[in-house]
């Protein structure tokens, strides 16, 4: 599938440039687009393909009412899928012209994508090749520091995507906020039932599999979400005290649907950039899901005008870390609608 996207040019038919990718190419693109990370791997998106454009919609049935009551995580997840789609199109030879929130009467219609022929450069190809390699790695990382040049490269990507990126210096304050969010969730029965339904899974096409969930470590510098049914061992010889990951916070000037969609796109761009550089990464959303702790992140960690939209943990995986398996995805027929002729 990756070779189809990045190594061949299917823009021509009978010697002439085609105005729109054919069905095989669209399936290849959307296969990569649906590899985007999403809240609890719910994959809360729907795609509609017509004769001249692609359309991204939310899938309200995949919203988590207890984890994500205001739908922030849903929009961020769809934004990541949108960016994955744009990257895959570019690598295949199509420039995407994205119209965000194109229908005021339908807030679930997040994007309309028109395309034109395009000659991909090596950077676009490399980014697309990172899509199937990217993993959400919740394990302990190594003591190797993330270099200033690597942080600068990620900051430049964030700026290109229209968001602000900051490295979290107030780690102790963030640690306390994360613990407060976890405590609030631990006393929310509906949340716990929902989390148990979507994590620790075996043989499902959605949700977080047990094989991708490490044992929770409350001594971690920034503790992760307490998923159900962990089945992943920590890398041998690692300890939270030696974990030298950085925490990045992405922020925007506004706090609305468009800002959240853009932040999701930027999240995708940063995660793929980290993958290209060989870095491990993991989004952190729990402290931003509760209004009180989200305000605390804004006041005590972000410390600037605007709104924090996403936290990312980035670092070097331990040399002893086993390769992570990919998380499952719903079949394309479950998330893609093909318009009639």
Language-model segment annotations:
Residues 1-341:
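Acidic, surface-exposed loops and disordered segments
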């Amino acid at each position: 599938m990756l070779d189809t996207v990045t190594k061949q040019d299917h823009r021509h038919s009978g010697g002439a440039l085609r105005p729109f990718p054919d069905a095989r190419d669209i399936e290849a693109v959307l296969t990569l687009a649906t590899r985007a990370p999403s809240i609890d791997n719910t994959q809360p998106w729907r795609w509609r393909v017509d004769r001249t454009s692609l359309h991204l919609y939310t899938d309200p049935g995949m919203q988590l009412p207890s984890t994500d009551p205001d739908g922030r995580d849903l929009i961020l997840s769809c934004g990541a899928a949108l960016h994955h789609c744009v990257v895959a199109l570019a690598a295949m030879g199509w420039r995407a012209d994205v119209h965000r929130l194109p229908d005021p009467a339908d807030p679930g219609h997040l994007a309309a994508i028109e395309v034109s022929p395009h000659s991909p450069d090596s950077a676009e190809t490399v980014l697309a090749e990172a899509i199937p390699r990217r993993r959400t790695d919740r394990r302990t990382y190594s003591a190797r520091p993330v270099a200033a040049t690597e942080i600068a490269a990620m900051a430049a990507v964030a700026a290109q995507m229209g968001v602000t990126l900051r490295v979290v210096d107030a780690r102790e304050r963030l640690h306390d906020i994360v613990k407060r969010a976890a405590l609030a969730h631990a006393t929310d029965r509906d949340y716990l039932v929902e989390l148990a339904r979507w994590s620790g899974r075996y043989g499902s096409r959605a949700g977080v599999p047990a094989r991708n969930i490490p044992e929770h470590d409350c001594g971690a510098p920034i503790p992760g979400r307490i998923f159900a049914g962990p089945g992943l061992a920590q890398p041998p010889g690692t300890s939270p005290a030696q974990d030298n990951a950085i925490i990045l916070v992405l922020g925007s000037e506004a706090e609305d649907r468009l800002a959240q969609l853009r932040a999701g796109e930027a999240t995708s761009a940063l995660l793929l950039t980290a993958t290209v550089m060989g870095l491990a990464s993991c989004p952190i959303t729990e402290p931003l899901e509760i209004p009180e702790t989200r305000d605390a992140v804004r006041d005590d960690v972000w410390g600037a005008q605007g709104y924090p939209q996403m936290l990312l943990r980035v670092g070097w995986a331990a040399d002893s870390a086993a390769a992570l398996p990919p998380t499952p995805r719903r079949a394309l027929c479950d998330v893609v609608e093909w318009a009639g002729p």
